[in-house]
C-alpha cells in the first residue's frame, strides 16, 4: 500500500509543478460597440393616439 501511495505521489508531482509554473494567456478586453442612436431616444408616446381611437363607452 505504501508503494502505491508513493507511485501516485511521483506521478502527480510533475502535473502539479507544471500547472503551477505555466502562465495562462489573458486575452485583451474588447470594448462593446456603442448603442445605436434610436436606443438613446425617449420612447414614443402611444397613449395619446390610442386615447383618440379607444374611448370608454358612454353611459346612457
Swiss-Prot record:
The keyword Amino-acid biosynthesis does not apply. GO terms for cellular component: cell outer membrane. GO terms for biological process: viral release from host cell by cytolysis. Keywords: Cell outer membrane, Cytolysis, Disulfide bond, Host cell lysis by virus, Lipoprotein, Membrane, Palmitate, Signal, Viral release from host cell. Pfam families: Rz1. It is a lipid-anchor. A lipid is attached at residue 20 (S-diacylglycerol cysteine). The keyword Lipoprotein applies. A lipid is attached at residue 20 (N-palmitoyl cysteine). Transmembrane segments: none annotated. It is found in: Cell outer membrane. Belongs to the lambdalikevirus o-spanin family. Component of the spanin complex that disrupts the outer membrane and causes cell lysis during virus exit. The spanin complex conducts the final step in cell lysis by disrupting the outer membrane after holin and endolysin action have permeabilized the inner membrane and degraded the host peptidoglycans. Homodimer; disulfide-linked. Interacts (via C-terminus) with RZ (via C-terminus). Part of the spanin complex which spans the entire periplasmic space. The spanin complex is composed of spanin, inner membrane subunit and spanin, outer membrane subunit. Encoded by the cryptic lambdoid prophage DLP12. This is Prophage outer membrane lipoprotein RzoD. It comes from Escherichia coli (strain K12).
